[in-house]
Amino acid sequence: MAHIQQSMQGALLDTVRGQNSLVNDLAKRRLYDTAVEEFNAKDRRPKINFSKSINEEQTLIVSQAYPEFQITFYNTQLAVHSLAAGLRSLELEYLMMQVPYGSLTYDIGGNFAAHLFKGRDYVHCCMPNLDLRDIMRHENQKDSVATYLSRLKARNKVLPAFQQEAFQRYSERSDEVVCNNTFQCCESNRYSSGGRVYAISLHSLYDIPADELGAALLRKNVHTLYAAFHFAEELLLEVSTVELPTIGGIFSRDGDKINFCFSNESTLNYSHSYSNLLKYVCKTYFPASNRFVYMKEFLITRVNTWFCKFTKLDTYTLYRGVYHRGCDQQEFYSAMEDAWHYKKTLAMLNSERIVLEDHSSVNYWFPKMKDMVIVPLFDVSLETQKRTKKEVIVSKDFVYTVLNHIRTYQAKALTYNNVLSFVESIRSRVIINGVTARSEWDVDKALLQSMAMTFFLITKLSMLKDELLVSKFTLSAKSVHEHVWDEIKRGCGNMFPSLKESLLRKKLISGSAEELEIEVPDMYVTFHDRFVAEYKASVEMPTIDISKDLSEAESYYSALSELSVLENSKDFDLEKFSRMCAINCVNPDIAAKIVVAVLSNESGVTLPFKEPTEGNMAEAMKSGEKDEVLTLGSQTDNTDLTSKSMVISGSLPLCGIASEISCDTFVRNEEINSLEEYHMLAAESVISNKMASIVYSGPLQVQQMQNYVDSLAASLSATVSNLKKLVKDSSVGFQDSLSKVGVFDVRKKMWLIKPTLKNHSWGVVQKFDGKCFLALLSYHNELPICDADWSKVAVSNESMVYSDMAKLRVLRKSIGEMPISVSSAKVTLVDGVPGCGKTKEILRRVNFSEDLVLVPGKEAAAMIRKRANQSGNIVANNDNVKTVDSFLMNLGKGPVCQFKRLFVDEGLMLHPGCVYFLVKLSLCNEAFVFGDTQQIPYINRVQNFPFPQHFSKLIVDETEKRRTTLRCPVDVTHFLNQCYDGAVTTTSKTQRSVGLEVVGGAAVMNPVTKPLKGKIVTFTQSDKLTMLSRGYQDVNTVHEIQGETYEEVSLVRLTPTPIHIISRESPHVLVGLTRHTRCFKYYTVVLDPLVKLVRDLECVSNFLLDVYMVDSVSAXQLQVSGVYLAENLFVQAPKSGDAQDLQFYYDKCLPGNSTVLNEFDAVTMNCSDISLNVKDCVLDFSKSVPLPRDNTKVPMTPVIRTAAERPRSQGLLENLVAMIKRNFNSPELSGTVDMENTASVVADRFFDSYFLKDKLSGCSLGDSGGKNIIDRQALIRWMEKQEKSTIGQLADYDFVDLPAIDQYRHIIKSQPKQKLDLSIQSEYPSLQTIVYHSKKINALFGPIFSELTRQMLSAIDTSRYLFFTRKTPEQIEEFFSDLDAHQPMEVLELDVSKYDKSQNEFHCAVEYEIWKRLGIDEFLAEVWKQGHRKTTLKDYTAGIKTCLWYQRKSGDVTTFIGNTVIIAACMASMLPMEKVIKAAFCGDDSLVYLPKGCELPNIQSCANLMWNFEAKLFKKTYGYFCGRYVIHHDRGAIVYVDPLKIISKLGAKHITDKEHLEEFRISLADVSKSLNNCAYYAQLDEAVREVHKTAPPGSFVYKCIVKFLSNRVLFESLFF
């Protein structure tokens, strides 16, 4: 049922998001009605006032534990154990809810005052005075009654009617309301009116002996007893103290006495009998007589309170016979094995049974014990040699995970130390879904050693028993006993010398001279028991008379059938109808017939409409065939008519709600006719190849208007160009649920690429002659209607509407042949802070009869019309409130209208040229542009189209400021004062509203386990798609919700890499932080500037919040000049320090990494359940369990603790996780990019920036034939670089045909790459993947690209640019040696995450254009291109096969040089390369030196929208390139290896032996040569501190690295 409701709700939400406005309105109305019904249902719940003062967390606990009540938290009373005291009233009301209203009820030990206040005159309270505390409680209840009455008297009020009868009974016959006897001795004999009798017990069962309960209940003829009491499962174990943390209670046990009290409070203890309490928990049947028995049934556990009920059963119902009691002696003796007191009690309980012939078995109901087991822990005293044992509750999954894993250990590896290491590791961290690392099992650290010993003993004995089953022992000089104990002693050592004697005494083993018997102890014990009873009499089960209820139900059913003929009968309020019939004593059937007759106009009473809506009024007042024509007459002047047709005709309009459909259809047809000029227009005539070279002249406003017109043409050009390329490239289709494009094959009448949207307005058509044209499309059965000469049709999301076409047509028509002119109207900018009421001000100032309102979106337009017309007077319509697109697209279709004033809402989000056109075309005298200068401005999403920075400024005549926000809470207003000039104030009463939560990763986000409140917002489109794929609904980006208001907002960031739009000054942060009115919460996976901002707002003092006014202070960077030597000195670094220095430095730079126990991460990922989101792929599950390998080499253990991991083994799960992280879920950040034209422009920029002009002629640039690229020498150069085995594999290759070039193999690297950050503490690092071609393909293309690379590098300006290919550290130093430290420079680094899988079709187009200009053969280039478009990956080791589109393959011949070329081209397209001092590129790393003060574009935005890169631009003092710090000084530069990276490698866990260790040392010593020069250690400290903020001065550790790397013996001391 839940699934059906969820599916219906999802379908309804999909309908709301549709494009049919009428269906949308109906769906929204349905959602609204559903919400109202839910709230009404919740309002009907019983209301409880919770006056005790508790915190927010406790408030949430109470609300979730008792959803049956509508609880109001007043927090007006401070009291001891406030939560427990407040819960007592809720527990009482919950128990009384189970009792039928008005039935005689006995409250055992109850609160008679509470029942009086509720008016329950049918409750009798047994309140015995067992001690002085009971007397005091009784007196307190009397005082509460007296206080209540005196308060009423002081206010001259009388008792409410519902309380009078109860108080009257208490006044006249108090013995019927309360008595001082125990329930067993209660003398009350109130008459029950023939109904059933009930009883409740709220925390009073402890004082009633369990053996007397049944008889006492039967004496009062109680049918059901509902009880509540505190209990903890741990009390069944041998523990002396148990805590109830939620309510703060403590159970303490001493023998049979159990005490209950509250921690940290001076209240008295409550003492009870432990054995009596145990009976209530463990027993199921409580005998009352030889016939009746009360059966206990647990109901639920809420906030440490157990609820149960005892129901009276007649045993004669089952069998005829007599009740008897007997003793099962065997059960008694077996239960008495241990001599503890509580075991005696349980033995007595198990021996005394009621026997049932059906042998029914019942398990105890322990909610906390689900999947929990009791594990024994053993210990031995070294002095007395006495064995001790205790029990603990542990997760069953934890026990089996440990036992199953250590059972795979070989005999030498099965030691106590290894078992303890694994137990400690998986207790601290478990890998969840191959992504997140967190603690999964809550096991006390103090028990780990004892539990490890238990697991070790169990496994050791199990292995010995298995060996005995396989074969018998062969006697030798040693006895069999000695062989076994030698085996155990090798694992245990000398830790437990009396272990053998302890096991013999326990009888776990027994032996003789010739044989050995081993009994493996139970791994754990579960909670269970069996109950058997026997009955021999049989009677009929008593029945309840429900004939009256059935009769009433039948009459209402008949009435409902009568009402079902009504329109919208599903919305008929049956509850109100039933209440009306009950109050007026009316037969429901008769009432239903009257209602149907009235609503069907058959009763003589006419209802013209059901609701006073415009549509129903028009329907009721419209003329019929025989009615006279109704005219307005003299009343026309007094009626506000906005339709010109109404004024002309003078007759009542005949348009209702449905008339909008025909109107919309008419407008669309007219639009198509006006756009016929585009139909069958050649695509080449629309595509512009010179977007980037447009020159504008004239005043700035005229230039902006020209730029806006050109941007529309550029957008249309880019869309047409991409569709043209798509229709030509598509040969084989693919099905993608998120495809934004579509290609239709006319001959096959099928979609080769099926788009997500339907009914596109236009597209690009390819005819059979290969030419492409634009076409306006029509559809039949969701398929386009095509001409006979059409071959294919390409569409995309940009071709859904005629927006750009229509706007471009209107603007060009309005311009004509005359130069563009600017309107003389006065333009006023209303600059308001978020939530200042800009829309409200527009509605207040506008005169809809002569003014025009324009808004960006149709939702905003509908909202303005609704608010303007809410009084019932229709003043706003489609003529005076429009969207900007609608105004521009439909201009000129009707008579020319001149408006007096123009109001543009959110005008700063528009292109400034668009605003000037709106002012000009509206013919207004004055224009008001409402916006926010600090929020998100206009963003140019057409890449390679010029939009200079100065074009973004809107030129106005006057600026008005609004600095009072009506929406933002006070703490957010404090932040606004830092962003705006002038004092920002607020009218909101909400003081504190912001909060944050750092989540463990994207895998944590799930709408079931982690529901988010309010509106869900993200910064990026990729995070939005991730949230939608996770199951969240109604997710938007910050840019999409600008201008909207929500009560609660949940802002989510799932991208761990830096995002340029998240900074304290970012307008995106400002928009995201100012959308809420009550509550804002930020969920992030990393600590970013917004986290710092939210924490600062949480710490603002109340004094500042009361003033809500802060002066803005501009922060200035303190500049300190460095001290440099006059020349590049070499000072030999002394060799000093020890291993502790290396460990200290590592822990300061990366705190916490050295404490991570990640040795068994791969094991826990394979052992635990996993849920992965994968693309379409084929999995061979026969490869899921790899064959075990006997690895005799044990790796050496490093002395230095780092985050290094052990090598991992390949397998289905490990390889699949690596493939998901490295190849799947590629980002989709790019905007609209004209692939071919933009790639050509980028290639031009690449060659102009990096190549020497005089060497261009020396390479093959422009030689498209590529005939001179490959010769014998080029082939020999390539073969010299290959291994002999590679050349040998090519010996049998005939080179007649090519293998499948789109087929790749996939493997993983066994050693994870270390990250120099803290991510290892919460993440599971994925392995690096290698995707490679066969050797045969590499033999053909390897020499080609090797020669192309050689020629390209030979023509590059090596004095300014370094392409890091096969360069030594000395050559890097030489390249940077001419840097001048006296020249102010900016050091830029572009950090790109997910570099390989972010590369899409555009990157391929850029790379192929560069190779083409370098002279590659066209045929081979096309072959290579097709091999990188749609590729198939096969992992034979793991059994995985999948398909990928584009992406950079990590193992083909162009991986390194291709990545280097792409990052260089990316930087060339964004930076002024003609000003660059130095630049270096290597793979995805880049380092650029620019003069100080250069104007830079928005690098991050361009990298996102054009290059699809999640990039972050860093500006530093010193460069960091390929794991090395570039330290420049006054006359040169020195390149230091990253010392932290060297220390991290010293914690390697893959070193097998000393020979391997020596090779490792030599490798590290080679890359660390520069550390021998200590002359520039001070500058190196500054460079390291730029990257790692917590790094201390490190000269001592640099010297220590030199010391250990230079000496073989010292280096060997770092491993053992």
From Swiss-Prot:
According to its UniProt record, which reaction does this protein catalyse? RNA(n) + a ribonucleoside 5'-triphosphate = RNA(n+1) + diphosphate; ATP + H2O = ADP + phosphate + H(+)
Q: What domain of life?
A: Viruses
- In this chain, ATP is annotated as bound at 832-839
Query: RdRp catalytic domain spans which residues?
Result: 1385-1498
Task: Spell out the molecular function terms from Gene Ontology.
Answer: ATP binding; ATP hydrolysis activity; mRNA methyltransferase activity; RNA binding; RNA helicase activity; RNA-directed RNA polymerase activity
User: Positions of the region Methyltransferase?
Assistant: 50-466
What GO biological process terms are annotated to this protein in UniProt?
A: DNA-templated transcription; mRNA modification; RNA processing; symbiont-mediated suppression of host innate immune response; viral RNA genome replication
EC numbers on record: 2.1.1.-, 2.7.7.-, 2.7.7.48, 3.6.4.13
(+)RNA virus helicase C-terminal domain residues are 963-1115
Gene3D superfamilies per record? 3.30.450.420, P-loop containing nucleotide triphosphate hydrolases (3.40.50.300)
- Per the record, which residues fall in region Helicase? 828-1084
(+)RNA virus helicase ATP-binding domain segment(s): 800-962
Q: Mention any additional remark.
A: This protein is translated as a fusion protein by episodic readthrough of a termination codon. When readthrough of the terminator codon TGA occurs between the codons for Ala-1115 and Gln-1117, this results in the addition of the RdRp region to the replicase.
Which family does the record assign? Belongs to the ssRNA positive-strand viruses RNA-directed RNA polymerase family.
Outline the subunit composition.
Heterodimer of a large and a small subunit.
This protein is called: Replicase large subunit
